[in-house]
Amino acid sequence: MRLSRFFLPILKETPKEAEIVSHRLMLRAGMMRQEAAGIYAWLPLGLRVLKKIEQIVREEQNRAGAIECLMPTLQLADLWRESGRYDAYGPEMLRITDRHKRELLYGPTNEEMITEIFRAYVRSYKNLPLNLYHIQWKFRDEQRPRFGVMRGREFLMKDAYSFDIDEAAARKSYNRMFVAYLRTFARMGLKAIPMRAETGPIGGDLSHEFIVLAETGESGVFCDSDVLNLPVPGDDVDYDGDLTPIIKQWTSVYAATEDVHDAERFEREVPADKKLNTRGIEVGQIFYFGTKYSDKMKALVAGPDGVDVPVHGGSYGVGVSRLVGAIIEACHDENGIKWPEEVAPFRAAILNLKQGSADTDAACEALYKELSAKGVDVLYDDTDQRAGGKFATADLIGIPWQILVGPKGLAEGKVELKRRADGSRENVTPAEAVARLTT
């Protein structure tokens, strides 16, 4: 993509309403625009990041055996009355009446609808286990939306729902999602810690929140620092095998949100030099809620003995749009964003330091064409902005690699390759720069 043809509305001044780093940088970098309180338009740069995060989530859900579908944003109020949650959910739910006086709601979550789909088609235990997920926009009418995408009213979420014949099978499904989440966040360059948590309006008696430690987080957390060094399962993890050792390794080290924190256990089990009492950002949460919804909504299957039994369920959420902000909170410096490579809007930026010079123009064009042909997402800054401005823009938007092309370097057959993560620089030939980015 040529920057001269890309829509990138950089802001020179930070909007006053932006209270935290991620909100400030997303607005300044032209990633989004606020349209109403807690509601944002995603501009091209932000959308590229959002789509890459969404794809990682999708790949790891598929790897763990979940099956993608897509449910509508609007749901019938009667479904929620059937489960008993319509009146219990509170003012965060956006309630709508259509022209025929039918009561609808803009879905804040989908347990009722997925249960209705399940009971319409699944009759036997032989069709279990089943895990269905979708990635869809949701709305919760937060009383005080703030912090940009971290606490907005409209947000993109992945929610998965598992169905099993009994509790033992349901806990296996829970474990699959637990491991899938570890892998998902690690691929995004995040250290997300699974912590025991309250179940809230979803219900059930087992839940873990996946928390990224950050002082700007909304959750108070307590953990043993050893949890930061635990290994994340690799590509060879067998989701059909026994995942219990992985789960035990991650849950035997103390980690809990403030809502379920056990002060006595924390004091007793965690050495003083390993105690962490800080704040964190919730990027995902998983629940096992047993037969809470299947009992009320009659989601039954015939068991091995032919007797109908309610299925055991779980739900598993990832805040896809919130992750954009969480990654920025974890990956930035005073100059801007430092995207991990897997979620960056572009992998490399070519900076033409003397636009209009025949030599630099030709070298940049050659690099741009070769990298593009080899499948590298590259942004070519072919604007007439001064070199200092180009450096500032590239740092602000956080492209992992910058190829600086100027007349002095080209005179020696070199370009400068800069790594945004650590600021390291190296003089290499154009061919070496291409090789570095394609191997």
Swiss-Prot record:
Domain of life: Bacteria
InterPro entries: aa-tRNA-synt_IIb, aa-tRNA-synth_II, aa-tRNA-synth_II/BPL/LPL, Anticodon-bd, Anticodon-bd_dom_sf, Pro-tRNA-ligase_IIa, Pro-tRNA-synth_IIa_bac-type, Pro-tRNA_synthetase
Compartmental location: Cytoplasm
UniProt EC number: 6.1.1.15
Catalytic activity: tRNA(Pro) + L-proline + ATP = L-prolyl-tRNA(Pro) + AMP + diphosphate
UniProt KW Cytoplasm keyword: yes
UniProt record, GO biological process: prolyl-tRNA aminoacylation
GO cellular component term, pick one: cytosol
Alphabetical UniProt keywords: Aminoacyl-tRNA synthetase, ATP-binding, Cytoplasm, Ligase, Nucleotide-binding, Protein biosynthesis
Enzyme class: ligase
Cross-referenced Gene3D superfamilies: Anticodon-binding domain, Bira Bifunctional Protein, Domain 2
Entry GO MF terms: ATP binding; proline-tRNA ligase activity
PANTHER family xref list: MITOCHONDRIAL RIBOSOME PROTEIN L39/PROLYL-TRNA LIGASE FAMILY MEMBER, PROLINE--TRNA LIGASE
Protein task: Catalyzes the attachment of proline to tRNA(Pro) in a two-step reaction: proline is first activated by ATP to form Pro-AMP and then transferred to the acceptor end of tRNA(Pro).
Subunit description: Homodimer.
Family in the record: Belongs to the class-II aminoacyl-tRNA synthetase family. ProS type 2 subfamily.
The protein's name in its UniProt record: Proline--tRNA ligase
